[in-house]
């Protein structure tokens, strides 16, 4: 059942990520990505290619828009070597990280969970992830993420699912009247 009106999804979402599940389904083990820099999170639909067929005199004869993709962008602050290594699938050795790759090779799942109950969140089950570790004297080490949905292997899995955040279940002692 849809809600009549949505709660505004003000800042401070919780973003979790992990390996994608079987056939492109949402992963079963997702972990918090860490502290997110203020006002860096965005999730938007990027429209697909538009094909247009014109006749003489620039008369539009036919038009077709292809499916788009969702793009999630955010920046993780206070990044540690362990955090950087984890996203690249590398290991830290004696307080050093040999950056043998700058590519996230495996598809990942993401959830964007809003702070407020009743606000809209998103599940992105099968994504390409581009990350950029960055150092600036004003912020220290950060990790910039750009996540793009891909078509899951299974046709029964949607590239993105929007949901309304529900209240957490009350403690069992409250529900039993104790």
What are these regions (language model features)?
Residues 119-178:
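Mixed-charge, glycine-accented linear interaction segment located at domain edges/termini
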